[in-house]
C-alpha cells in the first residue's frame, strides 16, 4: 500500500515534494511538508483549496507561486521600461535627507536598481511615469449617484499619488476657524489617520492586480479600499491589533520609511487608531479575500483634534 502510494506521488507530482509515509495500525498516514520549489503541479496543473473544494489556480496566482518558488516578490521583478526618471523622488529626498541629487549609487542602496537587471518594478512605481494603476478618488454628494468631484491618479509616481490624494482630502475635510486674531485649521477627519491609511494602502496592496485603490469620500466618512487581502501568514486578528510583521512590498516600504511617510513598519493601524484616541466614533476595518477596506469617520463638529 505504501509503495503504491509513493509511486503515485512520484509519477503524478512535479517537482516531487518532501513527504513522509507512516503505517499506524490499519491506517497509512501521509505527511506533506511545505516546499520551497513552488508551484507543485499535479499532472501539469496547480491547484489550491477553496473552502471545502480543490480548484485549479488562475494565471495570476500561478505567476505568484512561481515568484514565491524563486524567493522573489513582484516589486523585485525587472521593469520592462528601463527609461525611468525620478524627479519627484529626487525632490522628496532633497527635502527630507538633504542630498544634492539622486544618483545610481543611491538607487542601488534603495534596492531600486542593480547592474545586472537594471530597474525593478519598485523603481517603476516610484518613477515619474509608469504603467501602473493608482488611486481613484470620488467625492459623493448626498447619494452615491451624485458625484461632486473625481480624480483618477494613474501612470505617475506613487509619491505624487499620495501628495495629490492629500490635496483632495484637505479640500473637503479641512476648514479654517477664526478665533480672535488667529486662524485655526480644523480637521473633520484626522489628517494623520488619512495619510497613514493611504500610505499603507500603497505599500501593502497587490501591485500585480490591475485595479486602483478606491478612495470614496462621503459627508460622514472616507472609505479606502485597496486591492489584495491580508498577506499569507497574517490573521485578521493580528492585522487589527497592528501586528503586521510581513511587508508585502518591503522595497517601497523602506523608501516611505526613509521619507518619513510612515514611522515604523507594521504600525499603521495603531497610528490610525491613535489619531482617533479622544474621538467618540472610531475607525473600522474590513478584510476580504481580495481587498482590505479602512473606514475613517468624520468626528463631531465641536471636537477639536488640535487639542487632542
Regions found by a protein language model. Name each.
Residues 30, 125, 294:
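A residue-level signal for conserved active-site and pocket-lining positions in enzyme catalytic cores
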Residues 78-82, 133-135, 234-308:
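Flexible, glycine-/charge-rich segments associated with ATP-binding catalytic modules
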Residues 37, 51-211, 217-233, 237-246, ...:
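Active-site helix-to-loop segments that bind/position phosphate- or nucleotide-bearing substrates
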Residues 1-47:
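Divalent-cation
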Residues 35-41, 230-232, 300-305:
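Short, charged/polar, Gly/Pro-enriched secondary-structure boundary elements
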Residues 27, 221-223, 291:
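Structural motif
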Amino acid at each position: 500500500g505504501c509503495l503504491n502510494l509513493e509511486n503515485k506521488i512520484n509519477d503524478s507530482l512535479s517537482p516531487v515534494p518532501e513527504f513522509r509515509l507512516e503505517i499506524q495500525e490499519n491506517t497509512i498516514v501521509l505527511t506533506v511538508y511545505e516546499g520551497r520549489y513552488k508551484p507543485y503541479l499535479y499532472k501539469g496543473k496547480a491547484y489550491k483549496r477553496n473552502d471545502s473544494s480543490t480548484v485549479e489556480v488562475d494565471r495570476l496566482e500561478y505567476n505568484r507561486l512561481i515568484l514565491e518558488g524563486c524567493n522573489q516578490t513582484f516589486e523585485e521583478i525587472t521593469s520592462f521600461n528601463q527609461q525611468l526618471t525620478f524627479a519627484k523622488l529626487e525632490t522628496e529626498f532633497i527635502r527630507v535627507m538633504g542630498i544634492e541629487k539622486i544618483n545610481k549609487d543611491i538607487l542601488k542602496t534603495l534596492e531600486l536598481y542593480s547592474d545586472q537587471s537594471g530597474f525593478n518594478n519598485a523603481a517603476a512605481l516610484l518613477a515619474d511615469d509608469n504603467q501602473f494603476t493608482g488611486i481613484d478618488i470620488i467625492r459623493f454628494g448626498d447619494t452615491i449617484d451624485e458625484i461632486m468631484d473625481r480624480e483618477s491618479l494613474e501612470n505617475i509616481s506613487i509619491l505624487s499619488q499620495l501628495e495629490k490624494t492629500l490635496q483632495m482630502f484637505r479640500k473637503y475635510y479641512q476648514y479654517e476657524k477664526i478665533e480672535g486674531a488667529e486662524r485655526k485649521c480644523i480637521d473633520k477627519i484626522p489628517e494623520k489617520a488619512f495619510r497613514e491609511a493611504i500610505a499603507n494602502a500603497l505599500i501593502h496592496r497587490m501591485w500585480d492586480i490591475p485595479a486602483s485603490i478606491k478612495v470614496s469620500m462621503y459627508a460622514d466618512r472616507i472609505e479606502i479600499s485597496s486591492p489584495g487581502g491580508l498577506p499569507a501568514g497574517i490573521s485578521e486578528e493580528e492585522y487589527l491589533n497592528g501586528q503586521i510583521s510581513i511587508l508585502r512590498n518591503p522595497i517601497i516600504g523602506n523608501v516611505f520609511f526613509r521619507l518619513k511617510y510612515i514611522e515604523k513598519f507594521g504600525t499603521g493601524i495603531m497610528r490610525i487608531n491613535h489619531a482617533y484616541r479622544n474621538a467618540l466614533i472610531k475607525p473600522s476595518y474590513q478584510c476580504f479575500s481580495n481587498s482590505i477596506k479602512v473606514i475613517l469617520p468624520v468626528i463631531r463638529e465641536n471636537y477639536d483634534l488640535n487639542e487632542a
